[in-house]
A protein has these predicted regions:
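ATP-binding glycine-rich phosphate-binding loop
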Residues: 292-298, 308-337
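Conserved class I S-adenosyl-L-methionine
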Residues: 179-202
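Conserved SAM-binding loop of SAM-dependent methyltransferases across substrates and taxa
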Residues: 84-95
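Conserved kinase catalytic-core helix
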Residues: 360-372, 396-441
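N-terminal auxiliary segments of SAM/dcSAM-dependent transferases
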Residues: 1-37
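A short glycine-rich, Lys/Arg-flanked "PGG" loop and its adjoining helix->strand segment in the class I
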Residues: 159-177
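Short alpha-helix
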Residues: 213-237
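ATP-binding glycine-rich loop module of kinase domains
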Residues: 325-357
Length: 446
C-alpha cells in the first residue's frame, strides 16, 4: 500500500500496523511542527520551544554531516533509519532519487511533511529485515547516520554488526559507498565527563558497556575489525567535531586538526556533564602524540569495496547565521595530491555572497599592496570561490610561540607592527554605514 503526503510517497507494505518504538508525546509535538511550519521557521521554533528533541531533529546543522559529500545529482541513495528526516532534505537536494527506510510511521510522517515538496523522495515504512528482502535496486550511496550502533535491533544474528554491513553491501553498485556516522566509544568527551549518549550514564561505553545492552559503539580498532570481517571493506576516515550530531568542522586522516584548534566544550545540549579536565589541552597532547584518531568524539566513514579516496579532506562550516551568508570552507585533494580551498554556499541564498568574494579579493589586493601584504588569490569557479592552499607559519602561530617562550617584548612589537599596517590602510578609506549596517543595530562608533 502507498499513500502520499505532498509529493512524498509512503510505502506501508511492510508496516506491522503499529509503531514498535516511540519517544512519547514529544513526537506528537514534532509531527505538528512538521505539518504546520515551513522549514524556514524551524530555527525560530527551536528557539521558542527550548526542547532537546526538537533541536536534535529540526536543526539544519544536522545536515552538515553529509551536505559536503561530492554528489553529482545523478545518484540513487538509500537512507536506512531516516527517523524524522534530519538529513533527508540534504540528500533530496543533492541526489536524483532518495529512498528511506524507517520503522516508525509517526517519524516517517514527520519526515514526509517537512519534505513534502520533494518529488524524489520515497519512504518505506517497516522493519529493515522485512523491507530488505524486497529491495531490487542498486544504490550509489547508502547512509547510516546514527544508526549502526543499533545493529542488534536491525539484524538478528550471532554477529549483527558485521552482518549489517554485509547485507547493506549487497545493495551497492560496484563503485557504491556507505556513509556511516557514529560516536567513538573512546571519544575524549566521555573521559572528560560527558555521559554515554544512549544510556545517559558516566563511563558506560569506555568501560565496555558492563550494565547495558542493545546499543553499542566502537573504537577505531574495533571498527577496522568489523570492516575486515564484513568483506575486507575499505574506508576513508573523517572526524566530525565536536561530534557527528552537530558537526561544525570535519577533519580526516589526510588533514588532522592543528594544535589549539579543538576548543569547543559546550556541546552537551541534552544532559548535564562533569568537567574533569580541560579538553583543549588534552587534545593538544593527543595531537602531538598522533593519537587524535583514537580519541575523536565521533567517526564519519565513507566505506567502499575499494578505497574510496573521497576528494574533500577538511570541511569547516559557517552556517549558524543568516542564510544569505551561510557557507562552508572545503579543502580537497586531487588525484595528483594537489590541495585546493573552496568557499561553497550552504544555501542557494548565499550564492551571491560567495560570488562577491572575488570582488572583495580584488579590492583588498589593491588596498594592501602599499603595505606589502599579499592577499590570497581568489577566483570564481561555478558557484564556488576557489583560493590557493598556502602552507607556512601564521601570525597567530608566531604570536602563540612568542607568548609560550615569554618573549613578550617581541610579541608586542610584532603584534602592533601589524596593527599599524592595518590602520595605515584603513585610515585612507572612510567607513560608510550602510542602511543594512544600521538595521543590524551595529551603529556604534568607528
Amino acid at each position: 500500500m502507498e499513500e502520499k503526503i505532498g509529493k512524498v510517497i509512503l510505502d506501508t507494505t511492510c508496516y506491522p500496523g503499529k509503531d514498535l518504538y516511540s519517544d512519547g508525546a514529544i513526537e506528537d509535538e514534532m509531527l505538528a511542527i512538521s505539518r504546520d511550519f515551513a522549514p524556514e521557521e524551524f530555527n525560530r521554533v527551536i528557539s521558542e520551544r527550548k526542547s532537546w528533541p526538537i533541536l536534535y531533529h529540526f536543526s539544519h546543522i544536522r545536515e552538515n554531516i553529509l551536505s559536503w559529500i561530492p554528489f553529482t545529482g545523478e545518484e540513487k541513495v538509500l537512507e536506512i533509519g531516516s527517523g524524522c528526516g534530519a538529513v533527508t532534505g540534504a540528500l533530496c537536494e543533492r541526489a536524483k532519487e532518495v529512498t528511506c527506510i524507517e520503522l516508525s510511521m509517526k517519524r516517517s510522517k514527520i519526515n514526509a511533511y517537512r519534505h513534502q515538496d520533494q518529488d524524489n523522495l520515497k519512504i518505506l515504512v517497516g522493519n529493515f529485515q522485512e523491507i530488505e528482502k524486497n529491495l531490487t535496486e542498486k544504490y550509489d550511496y547508502i547512509t547510516l547516520i546514527g544508526v549502526f550502533e543499533y545493529g542488534e535491533s536491525y539484524i538478528r544474528s550471532e554477529n549483527p554488526y558485521v552482518d549489517f554491513l554485509r547485507i547493506i553491501s549487497k545493495h551497492l553498485k560496484p563503485d557504491g559507498k556507505i556513509i556511516l556516522a557514529i560516536e567513538n566509544r573512546l571519544g575524549l568527551k566521555y573521559w572528560a565527563g560527558c555521559t554515554e549518549d544512549h544510556f545517559g550514564t558516566l563511563f558506560e561505553g569506555i568501560q565496555g558497556y558492563p550494565k547495558t545492552k542493545g546499543v553499542k559503539t566502537f573504537s577505531r580498532k574495533e571498527f577496522n575489525g568489523i570492516l575486515e570481517e564484513a568483506g575486507n571493506l575499505k574506508a576513508d576516515w573523517y572526524y566530525p567535531y565536536p561530534d557527528y550530531k552537530f558537526p561544525m568542522t570535519i577533519h580526516s586522516d589526510r588533514h588532522l586538526p592543528a594544535s589549539g584548534e579543538l576548543h569547543m566544550r559546550d556541546y552537551n545540549f541534552d544532559r548535564l556533564r562533569l568537567d574533569l579536565f580541560q579538553e583543549s589541552q588534552v587534545y593538544n597532547t593527543l595531537l602531538s602524540n598522533d593519537l587524535y584518531p583514537q580519541f575523536a568524539n565521533s567517526f564519519l566513514l565513507v566505506i567502499g569495496k575499494e578505497q574510496p579516496q573521497t576528494a574533500p579532506v577538511y570541511v569547516k562550516f559557517s552556517n549558524e547565521r543568516d542564510q544569505k551568508l551561510s557557507i562552508y570552507t572545503e579543502i580537497s585533494e586531487a588525484a595528483d595530491g594537489q590541495l585546493t580551498v573552496k568557499k561553497v554556499p550552504s544555501q542557494k541564498k548565499a550564492a551571491a555572497h560567495v560570488r562577491n568574494l572575488g570582488t572583495i579579493c580584488e579590492e583588498l589586493t589593491g588596498m594592501y599592496k602599499e603595505e606589502k601584504i599579499e592577499v590570497n588569490r581568489c577566483r570564481l569557479k561555478g558557484d564556488c570561490a576557489q583560493l590557493e592552499y598556502l602552507t607556512g607559519i601564521t601570525l597567530e602561530d608566531k604570536l602563540d610561540h612568542l607568548l609560550e617562550e615569554g618573549r613578550t617584548e617581541e610579541l608586542e612589537k610584532l603584534f602592533f607592527s601589524y596593527i599599524q599596517k592595518v590602520k595605515n590602510i584603513h585610515e585612507k578609506n572612510h567607513f560608510e554605514k550602510t542602511p543594512e549596517f544600521v538595521r543590524q543595530d551595529c551603529n556604534g562608533a568607528f
